């Protein structure tokens, strides 16, 4: 019995805490609403910040802006008389009301994540870390967004890093 207790204790010590995680399905952001699934993002709690394990396809090769957005919706909306894909997701998650896009290491939007790099086949398979986000509960009932273009982590020369249109969106549940 004592051996069983010791063995059980050793197993439990090897896994001191099972970090919370969730999988977000990412869909094309279209003027008519969410389109076909283009991949997944597994978000998990880990030392150093939330980890975002991204597996996506159908992107253009190169860099893409990647952010947590305010609202849990990927529905289109109307802005300046035009339909905008995934507009209902709102802006970048910014609980501190900084109104600044300074990247994942900066003191701006908490939703600024490291940009993604799609290979020549338009696929992304990488894990990025959000050092300012520690708990999954902080971003539940929000959305993830991948933009068409890169992100320079600045509001100049274009606002919000110049990432351009919304390419893919998923709701964090």
UniProtKB/Swiss-Prot annotation:
The UniProt record lists the keyword Transport: no
GO cellular component: periplasmic space
Catalytic reaction(s) noted: 2 superoxide + 2 H(+) = H2O2 + O2
Cofactor annotation: Cu cation; Zn(2+)
Key words of the record: Antioxidant, Copper, Disulfide bond, Metal-binding, Oxidoreductase, Periplasm, Signal, Zinc
Domain of life: Bacteria
Broadest EC class assigned to this enzyme: oxidoreductase
Secretion signal, residue range per the UniProt entry: 1-19
CDD domains membership: Cu-Zn_Superoxide_Dismutase (cd00305)
Cofactor descriptive note: Binds 1 copper ion per subunit.
Subcellular location: Periplasm
Entry-linked InterPro entries: SOD-like_Cu/Zn_dom_sf, SOD_Cu/Zn_/chaperone, SOD_Cu/Zn_BS, SOD_Cu_Zn_dom
Amino-acid positions noted as binding Zn(2+) in the UniProt annotation, renumbered to this chain: 92, 101, 109, 112
EC number of this enzyme: 1.15.1.1
SUPFAM superfamilies: Cu,Zn superoxide dismutase-like
A molecular function (GO) term: superoxide dismutase activity
Disulfide bond sites: 74-169
Known partners and oligomeric status: Homodimer.
Family to which this protein belongs: Belongs to the Cu-Zn superoxide dismutase family.
Role played: Destroys radicals which are normally produced within the cells and which are toxic to biological systems.
NCBIfam families: PRK10290.1
Protein name: Superoxide dismutase [Cu-Zn]
The organism of origin for this protein: Brucella abortus biovar 1 (strain 9-941)
Lineage summary: Bacteria, Pseudomonadati, Pseudomonadota, Alphaproteobacteria, Hyphomicrobiales
